Amino acid sequence: IFSMGLVCAAAGRLLISKKQAESNDKNAMISGCAQEAADIVAGITVRELVPLVKADKSLVSDPIKATNAMVCSLDLSAGEKSFVKYGIRGVRGEAEDGFPSVINHALPRLHSDLLRGMSWNDAMIDALLVLYLIVDDTTVLNRGGSDGLAYIRAQAAAALSRGGMRLIEGRDFVQSLDADFSQRGLSPGGCADLLAVTVFLEMLSNKWTTQQKANGSAQCSS
C-alpha cells in the first residue's frame, strides 16, 4: 500500500505539474515519476526510523543486548525492526532514493522480456528474481534473518544464471523455489510490493506515451 500509494501520488503530481506533459519519452516519464516519489518522502528515514535507535548512551552498557531488547519489547513493523537491528532502511530508503531497484533493475528486465514476446506472467517472475537478488527485503529479514536473505539471493542468482523464465532449465528451477521458500517460511513481501510498482510503471509509461502520441497526431491533423 505504501509503495503503490506513493507512486500513484507521484504520477498524479507529475501530471498536474505538467513537467512531462509535452514529452512522449517513456524513460523521462518513469524517471520523473520516481523523482516525484522521492521528493514526497524526502527525510522519511530521519523522521521515522532514526528516533527508534536514539538512546541515552550512558545507560547502555551492552549496545547489542539493548538493541535486541528494544526489538523484542516494542511493537515495531518489520521495516522498523530491520533498521534498529541491521541499519537497513527498507522500503522507506527505497522510496527516498527514487526506487532504484525498480528503475535500474526490475523494470529493464520486465521490459526486455516483454519485447522478447514473453508473457506478462513470465516477465514478472524474471523481474521478481532480479528484485530478490538486490533488495534488502525486511520481511525476509524479520522472518529468516540475514541467513534467510542470503539464501533467497543465492537462489535468485542460481535461477537467473540458468536463464530465468527465458530458458527451460531456469523455468524448472524457478518452479522448485516455490515449495522451497514455503518450507523455509521465507516470503519476500517487500520484493512483491516493488514488483507491483514495476508493473504499474511499465503500464503507466506505455499508456502515457501512447496518449501523448495520439495528442500529437490530433494536433497535426487539426
Predicted regions and their residues:
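Active-site proximal loops enriched in glycine and acidic residues that flank catalytic Cys/His/Asp
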Residues: 199
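Phosphate-rich cofactor/ligand-interacting catalytic cores and adjacent structured alpha/beta frameworks
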Residues: 2-179, 183, 202-222
